């Protein structure tokens, strides 16, 4: 099976769907919103071609479910807020938003939400239907998606840790895994494995920057949010817990060791410095803003997180119940690729053990994601200077 066929979230609206298990991502988007507003404010001051009539925006790696339109709402509200600050100096522009993800993404679940979304925009923002146009642009964001110099703003959240392929060199000429017992570039991985993953990320992220810089107008903006490495050695990434759960099944005799050793996630979690260096080395963008922040795995399920818990989501204090929620969130993201390699039957067992490990680390305060927000502006061509 081709990798792109399984690089997707769980679709639909069932109990294991991404739509029902993305409260954490909702919180991250809320934390990014002030930076998004500032980015839009700077964009509208830049006097890009045709921006006063039609702002062209893309959300790269949009996934599915309500969070997709939460991002769209935040972008629209930010544009309208800046317009109000200008006291109607400019007419309210049309906004054209392209939702991008791989071809297997559940775009239909998003499209079904659009009629009510448009009505809500009209009621809350005064945007008449037709003044915000939303469509899909399926394809890999590591390839060209839009014509040259046609876009004003590109946004991506929690996507860039996904690589275009599993790095080469993880199996010797004799067919022996060089990453035994691991499923990605973890702290326990050997240095050659860590280098192979970093090299693949560098290649992919450089391609991402180069291709999308060509699609943006000069001075166009890009806002990226991604998982990043922290400085704390004892912090556990969710993929570490997933790795531990799969190893448990091997030890218990439910899974062959060779099956584990032949599996490597096309995922790399970079450091903030690695991201910064690649941007500077590629050279198409100026870094306007860079910040890191932490969010606990169980964020979205506690009043202390300052998260607007939805009415049908009960707030629990028991760590085992929280751990089940964390396991469901991770399952919604990784189940398709895990099932393609290990089989669907063993998925419940993997995440049952994942939840057990999560319940142990949640009380320690070491179960969190480090996150990076980076705001970029495309440098002008020499002919534009």
Swiss-Prot record:
Record note on cofactor: Binds 1 Mg(2+) ion per subunit.
Tissue and organ expression note: Expressed at low levels in young leaves but not in mature leaves. Barely detectable in fruits (grains).
SUPFAM superfamilies given in the database record: S-adenosyl-L-methionine-dependent methyltransferases
Catalytic activity line of the entry: xanthosine + S-adenosyl-L-methionine = 7-methylxanthosine + S-adenosyl-L-homocysteine
InterPro entries: MeTrfase_7, MeTrfase_capping, SAM-dependent_MTases_sf
One BP annotation, GO: methylation
Cofactor: Mg(2+)
Source domain of life: Eukaryota
EC number: 2.1.1.158
Residues that span the membrane, as ranges: none
Annotated pathway: Alkaloid biosynthesis
Keyword annotations of the record: Magnesium, Metal-binding, Methyltransferase, S-adenosyl-L-methionine, Transferase
Listed name of the protein: Xanthosine methyltransferase 2
């Amino acid at each position: 099976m081709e990798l792109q066929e399984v690089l997707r979230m769980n679709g639909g609206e069932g109990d294991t769907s991404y739509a029902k298990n993305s409260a954490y991502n909702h919180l991250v988007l809320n934390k990014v919103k002030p930076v998004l507003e500032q980015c839009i404010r700077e964009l509208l001051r830049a006097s890009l071609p045709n921006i006063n009539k039609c702002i062209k925006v893309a959300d790269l790696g949009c996934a599915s479910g309500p969070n997709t339109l939460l991002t769209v709402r935040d972008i629209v509200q930010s544009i309208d807020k800046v317009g109000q600050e200008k006291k109607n100096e400019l007419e309210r522009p049309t906004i054209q938003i392209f939702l991008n993800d791989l071809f297997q993404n559940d775009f239909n679940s998003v499209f079904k939400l659009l009629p009510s979304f448009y009505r809500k925009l009209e009621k809350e923002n005064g945007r008449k239907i037709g003044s915000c146009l939303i469509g899909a642009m399926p394809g890999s964001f590591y390839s060209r998606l839009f014509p040259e110099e046609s876009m004003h703003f590109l946004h991506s959240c929690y996507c860039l840790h996904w690589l275009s392929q599993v790095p080469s060199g993880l199996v010797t000429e004799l067919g022996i895994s060089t990453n035994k017992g691991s499923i990605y570039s973890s702290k326990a991985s050997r240095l050659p494995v860590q280098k192979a993953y970093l090299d693949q990320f560098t290649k992919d992220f450089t391609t991402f920057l180069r291709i999308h810089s060509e699609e943006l107008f000069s001075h166009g903006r890009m806002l990226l949010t991604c998982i990043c490495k922290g400085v704390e050695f004892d912090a556990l990434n969710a993929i570490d817990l997933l790795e531990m759960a799969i190893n448990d099944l091997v030890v218990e005799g439910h899974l062959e060791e060779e099956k584990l050793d032949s599996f490597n996630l096309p995922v790399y979690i970079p450091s903030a410095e690695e991201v910064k260096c690649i941007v500077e080395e590629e050279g198409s963008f100026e870094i306007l803003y860079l910040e890191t922040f932490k969010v606990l795995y169980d964020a979205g399920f506690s009043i202390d997180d300052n998260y607007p818990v939805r009415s049908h989501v009960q707030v629990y204090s028991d760590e085992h119940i929280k751990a089940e929620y964390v396991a469901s969130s991770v399952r919604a993201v990784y189940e398709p690729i895990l099932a393609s390699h290990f089989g669907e039957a063993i998925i419940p067992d993997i995440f049952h053990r994942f939840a057990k490990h999560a319940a142990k680390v949640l009380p320690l305060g070491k179960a969190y994601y480090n996150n990076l927000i980076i705001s970029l502006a495309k440098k002008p061509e020499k002919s534009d200077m």
